[in-house]
Each structure stands twice: as C-alpha cells, then as structure tokens.
Amino acid sequence: MNHEVMNLFNPQAPAQTFDSIRISIASPEKILSWSYGEIKKPETINYRTFKPERDGLFCARIFGPIKDYECLCGKYKRMKYKGIICEKCGVEVTLSRVRRERMGHIELAAPVAHIWFLKSLPGRISTLLDLTLKDIERVLYFENYIVTEPGLTSLKLHQLLSEEEYMLAIDEFGEDQFTAMIGAEAIYELLAGMELDKIANDLRLELAETTSELKQKKLIKRLKIVENFLESGNKPEWMIMKTIPVIPPDLRPLVPLDGGRFATSDLNDLYRRVINRNNRLKRLIELRAPGIIVRNEKRMVQEAVDALFDNGRRGRVITGANKRPLKSLSDMLKGKQGRFRQNLLGKRVDYSGRSVIVTGPELKLHQCGLPKKMALELFKPFIYARLDAKGYSSTVKQAKKLVEKEHPEVWDILDEVIREHPVLLNRAPTLHRLGIQAFEPILIEGKAIQLHPLVCTAFNADFDGDQMAVHVPLSLEAQLEARVLMMSTNNILHPANGAPIIVPSQDMVLGLYYLSIVSEKEPGEGMAFSDIGELHYALENKVVTLHTKIKGRVKNMGKDGKEVAKLYDTTPGRLIIGELLPRNPNISFDIVNQEMTKKNISKMIDYVYRHCGQKETVIFCDRIMQLGFSYACRAGISFGKDDMVIPDSKSRLVAETEALAKEYEQQYNDGLITQGEKYNKVVDAWGKCTDRVADEMMKRIQAVDFDPKTGRQRPMNSIYMMSHSGARGSANQMRQLAGMRGLMAKPSGEIIETPIISNFKEGLTVNEYFNSTHGARKGLADTALKTANSGYLTRRLVDVAQDAIISAVDCGTAKGLTMQPIVDAGQIVASLGQRILGRTALVDILHPVSGEVILEGGAMIEEADVAKIEEAGIQSVQIRSALTCETRLGVCAKCYGRDLARGTPVNQGEAVGVIAAQSIGEPGTQLTMRTFHLGGTAQVVDSSYLEASYEGTVEIRNRNVARNSEGHLVVMGRNMAILIKDELGKERVVHRISYGAHIFVDDGDVVKRGQRIAEWDPYTRPILTEVEGYVGFEDMVDGLSVTETADESTGITKRLVIDWRANPRGAELKPAIIIHADKEGKSIAKLYKGGEARYMMSVETILSVELGAHVKAGDVIARLPMESAKTKDITGGLPRVAELFEARRPKDHAIIAEVSGTIRFGRGYKNKRRIIIEPNDETLEPVEYLIPKGKLFHFQEGDQIEKGDYILDGNPAPHDILAIKGVEALASYLVNEIQEVYRLQGVLINDKHIEVIVRQMLQKVEITESGDSGYIPGDNVDRIELDEINDNLIAEGKKPASGNPILLGITKASLQTPSFISAASFQETTRVLTEAAVSGKIDTLQGLKENVIVGRLIPAGTGGTISQIRRIAAVRDDLIVDEQRKSSNNEVAKAMLTNMTAESVSK
C-alpha cells in the first residue's frame, strides 16, 4: 500500500535528529537556493477576487496553493493531482502548509549593506576596512566618494572625496587614471578585494612591534574579526546584499476582518517599500536617468532595506498609517514579545484549567479536590476511550454526546479514569520549583479547587481569592515523573536550605501551642497516669484539664525493638501530641515535651524526617494538622480590645523623653550643638523610649496572674499566645497596638523627629496620622518596584546558571574551600556545623587530640559527623565545592554534596544551576529595596573593646607594641593579631587588633573567658609616635593650615588641621608633626627603619600635643575623628545582592595592596598622593597607587604592608580580591556578603547555591601569554577550553598559553555563554546573533535553554538519561551497520548485537 496514503491524516516528516546548530552569513547563492521565485510586484491580493496577485508578495505560483491540493484557477482539485503544476496559473498542487515554508527573493538593482553588520557594535564592516563608521555611512548614503584604486595618482586608497573634490580629481588626473566609487557598490568592491590571510599576518606582525596600548587594542579588535571570517568560511562581501530573501507569506499573514478591511503584518508594508523603490530604480537605470536621481533612488532602497531588517536603528523610524513604528524583522526576535521569549520559551499548554482555591483540611497530603466540572473537561479524551472500550459508544461523536448530557455512566467512568492519575497544580508566580506540585485528584462538588493546608507555604498561597492552574500530564512518562518527582509528599524539604517546608502555620500552630501550655494550680495537679486511655477518661470527666501539671508514662520502642516505658513530668495536652509520634527508638517524648511554637514544630518535623523517613513523616504531618485544627477550634482563642494592655509607665517614659528633647532643642538654640547632632540625639532618645515602652508592654502581657476566687491561673493573653507561638502577628505589631508606634520615616528615607506617641488602641491624632501615611505609601510603592526587580534578578541568575548540571559522579579534584564559622562582632552567626553539613570532605578530618580519623576524605558530612566534629572542637574544615570542581561541562556530584530537597547525595542530571538561581531569587521579594542612610549616633559604632571568647594562652603575631607615657601597651603595627590557643596548642580564635589600641595581655599570658584583651577609641583614628623625643611643628600656619576652635559645651580649645589648599597662599604647605631628638629642636629623631620621624597631617586631624612637649613611643600626637568616615550610605537588600552578582566596582572602592612590602611616598600630583610599595621580594617591580589627597590614609613612610591589606578603606571591588588574593578569597567574600543581606531578613540559603552562581561567573580566563596557541593576549577564553588546548600543546612539546581568571557579572556571563541561542534569548538579541553569524558559531546544545528552544528534551533529569541512552544506541547502530556493509555474511553483525544486548542488561 502506498506509504503516502497511510500517512494521510498525519503527513509529518520524521523528526530530524541533529546535535548542533550553526549560524553564518547567507551568501547570495544560498539565498537563491532557498527561494522558489522572484517577487517583482508590490501587490498582495486582488481586491475583488481576494486571490493573491501573480509575482506579488503572496503569489501562489511562488509560495504554493491557498487551499490543500487545489490550484489557484481551480483546474486541478483533489489529491490525485498531487505534484502537478497547473499550466494555466502555474501553481503546484500540494498542501497549503508549504506557504509556511517556501521563501521568495527580491533581486536588487543595486547592492545594499546589511544594517546589522554596519551598525551593531562593534561595526564589522568599518572595523574590517579600518575606517570609521561615519566614513562608511557617508559612502553608503551617497555623500562621499571613496577611492578604490588610486592608480599612479597622489590619492590614497580608502580616501574620501566629496562631489567637488571628485570632479577636481577627474579634471586633474583624468577619468581613467584612478577609480573612486560611491554607495554600497564601493564597499562591496573594497570587501571583495580584501586578502584576509595577508591582512591577518600583517596585523600579527604589527601587534608584535607596537607598544602603545591603545593601538594594541585596536589591532586586536581588527585581527579578531579577520580571523572570525577566515575560520568561519564567510566572505566579507556577503555583508553587502544583492538579493534579499522574502519570508514565507503565512508568517506575515494578511487576515480579512469583518467589514471588508484587512489586518496585515507590518513586514508586508516594509517589503512593499523595498519592492516599490527597487522597481523604480530599475526603471530609472533603464531610462538612463541623471546620476543624481539614480543615486537618490539607491539611497532610498538602502534605507528601505535598513527599515525592513531593523527599523529605527538608523535615521528616523518608519511608521505605519496610525503613527505606530512598524515591526521589523529584528523586532520580531527581540524582547519579551519577540520570537524567543514569547513563543519558544513561553508556550501555552492544552489540558489545563484554573479556578479559585479553598482550603481542604480533610484531604491527605498527596490529594487535592478537583471540581467535577473541571475534571470532566480535562479528562475528556480518557473518558471517550473508556466509553468506547466499555461499549457505551461506538464513535467519538456518540461519546461526546454522552459526556455533554452527563449520563450517570460518565461519572462512574470519570472516577475510574481519575483514580491514581496525578494532576499538576501551579500557582503564579512560580518562583521556585515547589510552585508546581503533583496531587491525586479527589472529585468534589462546587467550582473551587481544594488545596491541602500544609502545602500553602510552598506555593505561598492563601485563601483570600488566590487562583491556581491545573495541568494534566498525558503520557505515561509524564504521569510517572509527576508521581515520582513532583508529588507533594516527595517535596517535604526546601531546596534552598534543606529545612522542612511542610510546616503547620496559623491555626494549626495555635492549636498545638494551646495544647502544650502548662498552667499552675489547675485541677488534678500532680496526678500520675499509666496510659493514654486513663488520661482521656480523666479529661472527659474534667478531673484534669489540658494544661495540668501531671506525671505520665510514655511507652516507646527501645533500641532492641522491645517496648520501654518512662515517666515524664508533662501535661495531658502534650501527651496527646506525643501519641502521634512515630514509634522509633531514636524519637523520644522530649521533642514534644516543650512549648510547641512554630520553630519547635519545624524542628520536630525535621527530626522525624531524618530518623523515620518520608512515609512516616507525611502521615505524622497529616495527623498533626488534624490535631492542630481540632484544638484551635476547641480552644476558641479570640481577642478583644482589653487584651491589648497599655503599660502604666508609658506616660512617664514619654514625659521624660519629651523633657530630654526640649533640653536638646535648648542646647541647639544656645549654639552648643549643631543641627545634625540635635537631630541624632532626639531621634536616638525617642528610639530608646519606644523600645522601653514596648518592653514594659511585653512584661505586662506575659505576666501570669491568678484568679483570687478559685486560685487558678488566669488564661494566657490571646494576643501574646498568637504572637509567641508564631501563628500570626509579631512583637512589632503588638507594640503598635498597645505600646507606641514610634518614629516614622519621610519618603526620602529620613526619620521624622517627632514620633507617633499614640498607639492604635488609643487612636492617632490628625498630625500623627498624616506623618504615618508617608511611610505606608512608600511601603506600597516599594513593594511594586521590589517585585519587578526581584524577578529580573532571578531571570539573570537562571540565565547564567542554566547549564550547570550534575554531569559526573566525581571529578577527582584535589582543590576545595576551607570553611570556618562566621563570626560577627563576637557572635557566631553561622556555625561550622551549619556550613559543612551535607558537603563532601576534601581530606581526612582528624581529631585534634587523638589524631584519629573522624571522617575520611571524599565522604559526605552527615548530621552525626557534624556532631563529632563540633565535639572535637575543630574550627576549620576543608570541603569540596562546586567552585573548585574540575568537570568539563557542569558540576560533579561529589563537589556539590547533598541534594537539599531530598537529604541524599545529589543525583546525576540534577539541574543544580537552576535550583541555585531559584533559591537565591525566590526570597528576593522579602529583601528591602532601600539604601540605608546612616548618620551620627543613630547608628551605634563598632564595639570599642575585645573580650576573650575562649580560655587559653595568648600568642601575638607580628608583635609590634610600645609602652606609652601612661604605662599602657599600645599597638604600633598595622597587621598585629592576637591568637588564643587551647591547652593542646590549637588555634581557637584570631583577632586583628587595630593600630593604636591598648592591649592588656602579652605573649604567653593565660586568659579566662570574658577577660578584656584590648580596647580602643571607636570614634577616632590615632596617629602615634614611634620614637621618644620633643614635638615640633612643620608648616602649621595659623589660619592657613591650622585653626583653634573652642568646644562650647566644655570650653576646651582644640587645634584642628584645615584644608590648606583652599587658600592659594597655602598651596605649597605640607603640614606635619616632627619629633626632635633634643629639646632645642635641632635634629630630627630617626625611626628604627631609617626614615625621619615626620608625620604628615590630613584635613580634619585634631592635634593632641603642644609644641615642645616630651613624648614617648606609643603616645598619641594627633587623632582623626571617625564621624566623617561613618556617615556613609550602606546599600542594603536587593540592590546590594544585584551589585555583588553583577560584580560592579563600588563607588569609592577600597584600594588593596598587590604585594607585601614597604611604603614610600612619591611625588604627588595636584590633588592626588602617589604611594609606592617597594616589594620585599626583590624580583618584583615596585607598585604605584594614586590616592585622592583629602582621603584618610593611615600609613606612614617606611610602614610594612602585607599583600591584601587595604591601603584605602572602603568596600573592596571583587575583581581586585580575585586578582590579589585568589579564587578562594573571592568566593568567601561574595558568599559572606550575599549571605549577610539574606541573614538580616532571616532567610536561610545554603552556601552551595551562591557558590554555583559564582562558579558560573568565573568561567572565563584572560590570556596574558599566548604561547604557541592561536590566541591573542587579551582574549577571553573559556577556562576548560584553555586547559584542553594547553594539554594538547604540552603533549606536542609546545609552549602552553597562560591567563588570569576574570570575574564577569551575571549579565555579562550570560551573554558570553558558549551557546548563542541561549545568549540571544536573554538580552541584546541582534548583537549576539550578528557576532555569532560573523564567526560562524556552532551551538552544541549543551544547556537547558537551547534545547527548550529547538524543542527537544532538556539534558537534565530524565531527559538527560534518555538522551544518553539514545547516544549510546546511535553509536552501536553505526557499528552494526558498518559491520554489515563490510562482511557479506550477516552472522558477525548478529553476534555483535547479541553481545551488546547482554551488556545493556548486565548494566
């Protein structure tokens, strides 16, 4: 039977399998080979017959028939004439679908330049010809001639001539002595005449000779483009087009609207312009029109083609009839509405529905309630099939009727179909993978979807009118994936931090908390119960209450599997919760024998999950939910206005603060303090007052009081119960209800001095209400901005990390990171245990005392190991990290560690990059948007002392101290550190001690915990003298460089260094304090390093010594107030995270020393200081830095500085950290800084997610030495690619290339990904595609995005496994086919096949 007939209803060609996609510039021959005919007329369709015009933009002869198997004139109809070309109308009889595939072309009368290669930066045409873009445009748009062949004249090649100059040159040299051309023909000639090989060699030679950096950059840029053309096989002249392809008509349709009008695609207008102008130009050339007219027409053709390719890129935008810019071919691809993001990455799906959600507390965790109406519609095909199978209907039509009439059989069948067929529920916005989960549907009446209350946290759903979408997985594979991977019962842990996400909230927490409360003097106190039955009996008969203190016997499984009973002091309520605990030897009653706040419930669920596994946990969660709801209902907790207790002392505290504020006002009026100081003091006072009122209120609300009549404890305050349990509300909200609202901010972010004294219970005055509206309104505006910003951050993160997939089990690297606890101001913010849990140990972890191996290298660090490590007192552990993983594509499982959402080692094919991006992006909306503006006392300056946090022995590193005249030990070095070692000599803690601090301990001293080690003045930076002697001043001229100011409040005068450069007379001054060796001041004391004891002063320095005073080493001679350094804006929240991921250089960034050495001062500039570091390593060159003169600089000449020390304080630029301290330091800096922002909001994110993103930012290397490779210094190359090329070079005995790792921001890194499809769909589509086409890039489809775009399974998860199997199968097929070809007998091939099958089975 004919294969075609078999294929009648599904005439689909077999899908082509391909491994990669290449993009290059289309040559004119290529364009003609695509085309089915030339379009000569601008007409579209005939206005009377509505049939396409011949040779027009919709011509049926060129593009194919309008109706299936029917020619235009109607002579041939039906399938039997397939493939015949009608002799009357010239149309081929075939499917009308070909009108989506067949292209046409337009033959241009004059060549035109392709605007992408002309204008898309860097302009390829201009760079290649080594002309400026302006010059090229002048030639292209017919303003100037260009000399293409100078001959023997004095003209130069590529010289531009205006009309007049051209005429003069003709007069002077004669017309045939030289050639000068104009327009795209000229550029075509120049490009076609280029000898690329020769140019490349010349450029390389020139590069080797040139020394100027600017010239090098220019040459490299040109050489890169020349090499791109050479490698890709593109010819430069193809950037000038002689034929233009016309896209198929069904992709630019003309649609009839009712009322006889037509809607058309903008492309038709743009094509029409090109055809009209081109035809006119042809006519003019035939008519031998004057040159000026022809040139004008050629320019118009060039402009029309420009508009077709990229409207608005050059000249004015071409608009349609309604003044709207026309959408050109480029606009079709660009942006959110373009082809990539709208159609290829954002498809709509069938078999889906959406409805409002309501709570379904009687559902099990793996179920959802699906309205019957929806289910009937969604599962239609399945129902039709079953009706047919059971004989209720014989055709689809009959089945349809039955379903429409809702016959009773249909409902029975629907029940059957739905049983165990999971559906997917999704709530927008889907910020992380838990936003889509699978459930088994339960049919319900009504029209709302029922959702299980415990999964609300994951979906971030509530029942105030939220809607959710339902999707039906159709194929067996999809159902399998939904059940195994996406079922809500399989997603108990949060992928971002591994904590349970199925946690009771609100009512459930309140019910459980109520159950676990203990009350004094309740009936039946002190009774003992032997089992739970007795207890229930006693509760029923009101012998005891839920909160009575009793003794209860709890039975549990022992380690040997036998029952063990134990007596606990507890309450009946807690025993009821304990009843639900799974029977497991590891789980004791202690975890419920406490107040069940939300935190404790979460810990309990986590504990149960770790010890009993998933199934038990799910059952336990469901039971706990039921119990919570039930007792929340029975408790009947509600609150009235009397529950908000206003503290009695409030009025007193407010009055005291008001008096203080008045006093500050008076001091300001008397001129004792400045406006700023007054503001800070008042704000500070009110802040403290608010806190104190809140504390008093909390004391009142928490207080336990007894009923005088019965002697029983009165019920707890309901508001306190809700807030304390974590069910709803916070201490802050309680404060606003019953304390005082406190200070409010203006829209600019400044704090308004007058606070809101009232609370909501008392009610606000009009003034207070007005002040409070500022903040509230700003909050709403911020939220809207925040959502957009956070979404964009997530999009950039996903884009940069989408190709990080677990692709190997173990890469076998010996590199890793060192993890230590994070300590902030003496507090441990992240313990070592938290940071290393679920990571792989790099080397054996040894016990510091016994030396025994706690954990072998390469093993996963589990909870039990963490306990051992912390017990042993280990302070740092080396672990493997995605950052140091050496897998070629993706990351290996060992370096990644535990899959946080499963609690097991990560599987191969897991898309860890996307998970990392989601984990960082999802909490983005919780971060703040504001930049904190801090001033004066509103912010508490760093602590001013240091206490020992461990007991042990002190060791001082880089000891450099002096005893000053008061007998204190003063720190004289800038990199001195105090270590505390325990009795085993192991470092417990290291503190850097700042310059000028007083220390109270010395080497070898034994310290106790809490003993003070050092203290310093946090408000000033001291300048100390290093030698004993007498003070002398240099260039301290009153009124020019110093001034005396009296402190009004104390009357003490102080001498202050002022800006001496402000006055022209003082421009040459260099104010300094010098130390004389003798009292007369004849000789200057020498420092022990050899320099003179001269201390330069900077502006704002306060002098602390008088002229001629005797000073000892370590005495303060001047001090610089830190106020100026402290009032800086701190970028917080989302902008800070974005700044770090984009690797931007912060404003006023720190300057970091690149080498260790000695500081010298060089000759300064007008407003810059030159600082030179002479390296300790003789082989290195001295390094110079320029520092703005007014900036605080605290080194003196001759000081030692270590590599990585800050020469100038500020936020370091991440690039500097990478260049100076290396990858590990950069990683720990970025991880800690990003974590700090999230920690402030109480968001937990595992470090490994940030490390995965940082890994993606560090993929590139900048070539410094090209060796024998083909690279040019300055090239950015993929790190792994470079390693491979170097391995080959070394193997061949050649010189490898070397380079430095460079840090790219996430946007830049996404655009530089090896896949051009992924980069084009991200941002700057035209630029990416232009670049890819010129260099003939090949996309090997490694990442997720490219595969989604070309419509294949993604190479992650199950898709990865399938494609792997396919790949192996394809290789084997080839082997067998080859064998069959080679040998005439088929036996060998059969034997091979049997072997292969056996091999697969054994695997």
UniProtKB/Swiss-Prot annotation:
Record's cofactor remark = Binds 1 Mg(2+) ion per subunit.
Gene Ontology CC entries for this record: DNA-directed RNA polymerase complex
Q: Does this UniProt record's set of keywords contain Metal-binding? A: yes
Q: Name one GO molecular function term.
A: DNA-directed RNA polymerase activity
One GO BP = DNA-templated transcription
Query: Which cofactor is essential here?
Result: Mg(2+); Zn(2+)
Kind of enzyme, top EC level? transferase
Catalytic reaction(s) noted: RNA(n) + a ribonucleoside 5'-triphosphate = RNA(n+1) + diphosphate
Binding locations of Mg(2+): D462, D464, D466
Q: Which family does it belong to?
A: Belongs to the RNA polymerase beta' chain family.
* PANTHER family cross-referenced by the UniProt entry: DNA-DIRECTED RNA POLYMERASE, DNA-DIRECTED RNA POLYMERASE SUBUNIT BETA
In its UniProt entry, what is this protein called?
Answer: DNA-directed RNA polymerase subunit beta'
What is the species of this protein? Bartonella tribocorum (strain CIP 105476 / IBS 506)
Q: Which gene encodes it?
A: rpoC
